[in-house]
């Protein structure tokens, strides 16, 4: 996937991304202060909002092969089980109950499968949102602070799970997080955004340990 010269203007904010490229089978991080444009560029990548101008080359990936998980879970007003089955139903993918059971175990909701999903705790809802995004084996997954409502143990578990999936599937991940420990552990490559632009990018270890701009230095100092 490659985006070129993307622009998006709101009343009090302007986004301009000259170039961002994503390779298959890698995990990317996007970091930066609140309001710098991280979520906006992610929504543009995911096809949820349209840029005012610019080019997006998905490299053969359709929007049905992409999914996005937000900090605030967006769940159906239905059972846990119905939420897991829904992505398969709308894509007309054959239901595999063994796989569904696997994901119920992953999010530790086996005994709550018939519970009304919005009544779950915030951490449980976040887990359900994340595994719901995985059930149809998407090629591109966007996580917008999707681990932020989980306890430390759950975060570590899902970090391990994401790294395990990366080794066995061609999925590309794009992760926004204010927890630099998440980015450092998970991401192969990281973009730093400031004021609507990508100001620094590179191998994650180099970006975090050898900041190339004053804004990045300040961000790392206070994060």
Stretches with model-predicted labels:
Residues 205-223:
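C-terminal boundary and immediately downstream tail of ABC-type ATPase nucleotide-binding domains
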Residues 116-120:
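Conserved ABC ATPase signature
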Residues 177-178:
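H-loop/switch region of ABC-family ATPase nucleotide-binding domains
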Residues 46:
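Helix-to-loop junction immediately C-terminal to a conserved catalytic motif
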Residues 97-112:
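Conserved ABC ATPase "signature" region
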Residues 141-145:
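Catalytic Walker B motif of ABC-type/P-loop ATPase nucleotide-binding domains
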């Amino acid at each position: 996937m490659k985006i070129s010269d993307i622009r998006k203007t709101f009343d009090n904010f302007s986004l301009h991304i000259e170039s961002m490229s994503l390779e298959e089978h890698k995990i990317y991080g996007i970091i930066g202060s609140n309001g710098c444009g991280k979520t906006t560029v992610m929504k543009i990548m995911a096809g949820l909002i349209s840029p005012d101008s610019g080019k997006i080359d998905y490299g053969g990936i359709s929007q049905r092969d992409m999914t996005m998980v937000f900090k605030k879970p967006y769940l159906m007003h239905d059972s846990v089980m119905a939420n897991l089955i829904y992505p398969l139903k709308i894509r007309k993918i054959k239901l595999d109950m063994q796989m569904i059971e696997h994901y119920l175990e992953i999010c530790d909701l086996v005994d709550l499968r018939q519970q009304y999903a919005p009544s779950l705790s915030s951490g449980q809802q976040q887990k359900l949102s994340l595994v719901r995004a995985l059930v149809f084996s998407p090629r591109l997954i966007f996580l917008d602070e999707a681990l932020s409502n989980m306890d430390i143990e759950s975060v570590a578990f899902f970090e391990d799970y994401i790294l395990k999936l990366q080794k066995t599937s061609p999925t590309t991940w794009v992760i926004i997080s204010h927890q630099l420990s998440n980015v450092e552990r998970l991401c192969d490559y990281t973009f730093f955004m400031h004021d609507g632009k990508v100001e620094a990018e590179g191998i994650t270890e180099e970006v975090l340990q050898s900041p190339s701009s004053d804004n990045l230095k300040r961000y790392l100092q206070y994060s």
